[in-house]
Amino acid sequence: MPAPAATYERVVYKNPSEYHYMKVCLEFQDCGVGLNAAQFKQLLISAVKDLFGEVDAALPLDILTYEEKTLSAILRICSSGLVKLWSSLTLLGSYKGKKCAFRVIQVSPFLLALSGNSRELVLD
Amino acid sequence: MQTGPYYFVKNLPLHELITPEFISTFIKKGSCYALTYNTNIDEDNTVALVFMITSRNSPMIVSIDLMELSLNLDSKKYERISWSFKEKKPLKFDFLLAWHNTGSEESTMMSYFSKYQIQEHQPKVTLSTVRDLQCPVLQSSELDGAPEVSCQALELFDWLGAVFSNVSLNNEPNNFISTYCCPQPSTVVAKAYLCTITGFILPEKICLLLEHLCHYFDELKLAPWVTLSVQGFADSPVSWGKSEHGFWKGGEHLYNFVIFNNQDYWLQMAVGANDHCPP
């Protein structure tokens, strides 16, 4: 029996992602403070609350990965909340009285894009 | 399977990439690629050699067709370009280089650029095995999935990102830290093999890898599908074909092949907001 003819379908999506993903790192100016995942998330929520209020602090925000040693994380935020989260991270200046800043390393609507970072390519 | 080598050259004057000798040794005898190393496309001058040299420092883009140039090296156009790169604006960059030799002679980048501290590198390969991995159920004929039967192609795309970033896939809906879970319907596979290759990799090597993966299903296998994802350099000034590549919130341009055991395949291509739609 002859094989059926190959079919081809092309679908183009524009802004298909419900979420945006951010790879971030918290840096302290002097000696750091340890934060576990729950404390880290609480810090993010309070940063958004300080700038935008209670309602926006309830934006769905997930910490997909968290490394306590380096205080780095991959965050997932609904796309409509990206600007609010990013601006809150930008304006966060201290935690428990210690000066700190968030570094935003990568942002993408595609989580797969965050699995590598060509800007971090190191040649041995 | 070898996926390299590639080369790193420090402080290479840009005019070295348009000399008749370079063009006849590398450009005409294979596929040669170069990209400036450690230059951010949204901040610095960036140069890429694909089928042409493209230099970009927003909003200026300079494109030079080397093959066209090589047809008439006595032309005023070539003289002007050469003078610009040598005298008017003698730029130097650190370059990543790779070359696919289709000629019979054994020219090498190492000897050609020996006066410029050239180093040879091999792409870094990391292998890992994940046990009891929750995987989305897919149907090759249903890109948009079917309720209770299979997942959407977009859901697979994000799930792949989760797997390669070591994201936990089975969080409860009331978990404070994360509610992310594997798209449904899903199945648990006993073992999944992940391989990451990092470096300046030739398209020809990627094609070979893809061919190998296609042959994976020549014999009967339990796996329903395999995937190959490729990410372009965020700071490349070109994307698919000769399309200009941009960096706004991010410089992502990537593609993913899903090869099914029935020889169907999906090709997913994703670009950032500053790029044109892929071909």
Curated annotation (Swiss-Prot), chain A:
It is found in: Nucleus, Nucleolus. GO terms for biological process: tRNA 5'-leader removal. Signal peptide: none annotated. Keywords: Nucleus, RNA-binding, tRNA processing. The keyword tRNA processing applies. One of its GO terms (molecular function) is ribonuclease P activity. Its main location: nucleus. Disulfide bonds: none annotated. One of its GO terms (cellular component) is multimeric ribonuclease P complex. Coiled coil: none annotated. Pfam families: RNase_P_Rpp14. Component of ribonuclease P, a ribonucleoprotein complex that generates mature tRNA molecules by cleaving their 5'-ends. Belongs to the eukaryotic/archaeal RNase P protein component 2 family. RNase P consists of a catalytic RNA moiety and about 10 protein subunits; POP1, POP4, POP5, POP7, RPP14, RPP21, RPP25, RPP30, RPP38 and RPP40. Within the RNase P complex, POP1, POP7 and RPP25 form the 'finger' subcomplex, POP5, RPP14, RPP40 and homodimeric RPP30 form the 'palm' subcomplex, and RPP21, POP4 and RPP38 form the 'wrist' subcomplex. All subunits of the RNase P complex interact with the catalytic RNA. This protein is produced by a bicistronic gene which also produces the HTD2 protein from an overlapping reading frame. This is Ribonuclease P protein subunit p14. It comes from Homo sapiens (Human). The lineage of its organism: Eukaryota, Metazoa, Chordata, Craniata, Vertebrata.
